[in-house]
Amino acid sequence: MYPEIMLVPMREELTRIGIEETRTADAVDDAVRGTEGTLMVVVNSVCGCAAGKMRPGIRRAFDHATKPARSITVFAGQDGEATDRARGYFTGYPPSSPSIGFLREGQLVHMIQRSDIETRTADQIEALLTQAFDQYCGATAGAKS
């Protein structure tokens, strides 16, 4: 584990734009149960691809007109209980950090793994996210056709 003082700026990059920090398993479960619409779950990390790609991509994507109903973050390697619980919702995917999952009614509908993040630029991650926002977070997201 890293000293918390080192993590504050990494946490604040996301909380500053309105992403809620969840540090316990109960807080993660409460967010999943308490969200109508799409919940974006960000697994934050100290690694370079989180710092140089994922967090900047998320910040830029949050300028998009369509966004998740709610967004939360856990910090891998620091908030173990919360991270494990969040990953428990990422059915069918191995643990990876950083990563971003999209849940509707507690079910995973879209996943962006570390392998998707580390091979892209922040601009490309922004594009991935805005596409996911449009597909899973818009007014017609989840509508049966």
From Swiss-Prot:
Q: Provide the family line.
A: Belongs to the bacilliredoxin family.
The taxonomic lineage of its organism, from the top, reads:
Bacteria, Pseudomonadati, Acidobacteriota, Terriglobia, Terriglobales
- A matching Pfam family: Disulph_isomer
Enumerate the PANTHER family for this protein.
BACILLIREDOXIN BRXA (PTHR40052:SF2), UPF0403 PROTEIN YQIW-RELATED (PTHR40052)
> From what superkingdom does this record's organism come?
Bacteria
What name goes with this protein?
Bacilliredoxin Acid345_1880
Q: Give the GO biological process terms.
A: cell redox homeostasis
Can you tell me which residues the record assigns to a coiled coil? none
Question: Whose protein is this, by species?
Answer: Koribacter versatilis (strain Ellin345)
